[in-house]
């Protein structure tokens, strides 16, 4: 348990940041789920729109420090590969 005022304040700050970061991470997962659903349905147009939104949200999380840059890039790369595969299959 924190004994001095500075440590108590740090605990309060950490709790606030954790709440914000959890919300951001949840938002990213929501957009990733929308992309997954579009891929599962096989709808290329919806998947492309969902990809743009998911990529934007992932990169925003990276810039805010919620997701490591390499993790964000890896996820975007894998999403793009899946979209490309779906696009080829549909064509």
From Swiss-Prot:
One GO MF term attached to the UniProt entry: small ribosomal subunit rRNA binding
InterPro entries linked: Ribosomal_bS20, Ribosomal_bS20_sf
A Gene Ontology BP annotation from the UniProt entry: translation
Highest taxon, organism lineage: Bacteria
This protein's UniProt keywords: Ribonucleoprotein, Ribosomal protein, RNA-binding, rRNA-binding
Family indicated by similarity: Belongs to the bacterial ribosomal protein bS20 family.
Name the record gives this protein: Small ribosomal subunit protein bS20
Gene that encodes the chain: rpsT
């Amino acid at each position: 348990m924190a004994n001095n005022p500075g440590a108590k304040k740090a605990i309060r700050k950490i709790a606030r940041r954790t709440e914000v970061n959890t919300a951001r991470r949840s938002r990213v997962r929501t957009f990733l789920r929308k992309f997954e659903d579009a891929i599962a349905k096989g709808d290329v147009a919806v998947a492309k729109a969902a990809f743009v939104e998911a990529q934007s949200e992932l990169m925003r999380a990276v810039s805010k420090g919620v997701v490591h840059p390499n993790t964000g890039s890896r996820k975007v790369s894998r999403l793009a590969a899946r979209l490309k595969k779906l696009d080829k299959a549909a064509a």
